[in-house]
């Protein structure tokens, strides 16, 4: 499965906007392709410390994840990042969020 930057951003925003701060994805025997893809991307995000699994199939943002979503949720900034080369995207991020979030996002998105 390929990494999907849009899906990662959408999941971060979805987590931040959730009333309970937790989304339930995965862990179902008959999961849809969408659920399997979301769970895969959440695990990639967990690898970089942006989210943690709270209980069976529940996911929440970490402090670094909140920093990341603050930067990536601004649509104009996101569009700028997507059109930038890896080095330029990394430099743009450095001015927009914490150093831990920059490192996590850059590695996850392939920009650093």
Q: Where is each model-derived feature located?
A:
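A short, conserved structural fragment
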Residues: 43-56
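Short, amphipathic alpha-helical interaction segments positioned at domain boundaries
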Residues: 63-88
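Short, mixed-charge amphipathic alpha-helical segments
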Residues: 30-34, 51
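Short alpha-helix boundary/capping elements
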Residues: 16-20, 50, 73
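Short amphipathic alpha-helical interface segments
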Residues: 2-31
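Leucine-rich, amphipathic alpha-helical/linker segments
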Residues: 81-112
């Amino acid at each position: 499965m390929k990494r999907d930057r849009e899906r990662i951003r959408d999941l971060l925003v979805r987590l931040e906007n959730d009333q309970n701060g937790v989304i339930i994805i995965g862990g179902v025997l008959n999961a849809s392709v969408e659920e399997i893809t979301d769970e895969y991307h959440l695990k990639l995000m967990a690898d970089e410390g942006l989210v943690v699994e709270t209980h069976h199939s529940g996911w929440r943002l970490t402090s670094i994840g909140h920093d990341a979503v603050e930067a990536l949720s601004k649509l104009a900034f996101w569009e700028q990042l997507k059109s930038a080369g890896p080095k330029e995207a990394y430099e743009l991020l450095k001015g927009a969020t914490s150093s831990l979030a920059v490192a996590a996002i850059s590695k996850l998105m392939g920009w650093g």
